[in-house]
Amino acid sequence: MTVYINDLSCFTPFGDLQETWKGVTNNKVAYGPITKFDPNESRWTRSKVAGEFHFDAKEYPIITESERDRLPESNQWALALASQINLDGLDKSRTGVIVSPGFSMYLEILQSNKENADNIYHYCPDMIAHNINMKYGLTGASAMTLTACSTGIYSVIWAAMMIEMGMVDNVIAGSVDKTIHPDAFKQMGKLRALSTKYNDTPEKASRPYDTQRDGLVLSEGGALFLLSKHKTDNTICEIDGYAINNDAYQTVAPHPDGKVVQECMKDALKDTTPSLINVHGTSTPMGDYAELDAINRLGLKD
């Protein structure tokens, strides 16, 4: 069965979908100095650069005053993103939701006040999908995944699998991650995964595959996709293949030989040939090398 992507929405440090597309196609960068907290308060916050998304729930009438007070901001982002997905004509009993909060839930518990910290919405990561179910009356399967950097694409793959198995006809799938928080920078800083060499020139900090790369730039945002078994006049693309595996290696670094990455890409591409490769491209010395080596050994470098 072919699964189609019929709609999408996103929030990035550029802004919404239109602003993001404009920024990317004009070769702009959307990260800069950290403004959401003082990075000088901790010796572990060596990286001073971030891709921040600034959100005002009042700009989205779909989010009620009660929800603004009650829900973690990441959940509000998801509701706002879902409001930009066209659900007209869909059978709501056959429409599911797989949306995940990334690490937002844990960070929002840390920054919430005592009253909100006792709120179940801050403790149950699946509530982010459940809130979309309730808001739009979608009674199909509801779930979430949490797999670090691959959380969003995992959600999309599981959504496609659910459609192929006949469990649902449509799925809203994706992830949001509200990560600009002191503890995120402390923990990533301890792992030495963040760029620290370009604090004074933040526009140069993220440089995947560059010989001067020194780490990633922590950023935040989210994206949702509408997957369906039905092709429409608004269909954006179709899913021709996917694969999932893992290195069984280090927590924050791929195996340097890239063999497992190569196997995953080979499995995903068995029925298709790509015209564009969207790499992970973390701008870390080990990660970029292993990924590029795997691509080259697959013969996809051209």
Question: Model regions: which residues?
Answer:
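N-terminal amphipathic, basic-rich helices that act as targeting or association modules
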Residues: 1-8, 67-91
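Condensing-enzyme catalytic core mediating Claisen C-C bond formation in acyl metabolism
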Residues: 2-10, 17-36, 41-45, 202-276
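Conserved catalytic cysteine-centered active-site region
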Residues: 32-76, 102-111, 117-158, 190-217, ...
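Short, well-ordered amphipathic alpha-helical segments that serve as non-catalytic structural scaffolds
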Residues: 76-87, 126-129, 257-272, 294
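Active-site-proximal alpha-helical scaffold in enzymes
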Residues: 79-83, 136, 143-177, 216-233
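Beta-strand segments within the central parallel beta-sheet cores of soluble alpha/beta enzyme folds
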Residues: 96-99, 142-146, 168-176, 236-242, ...
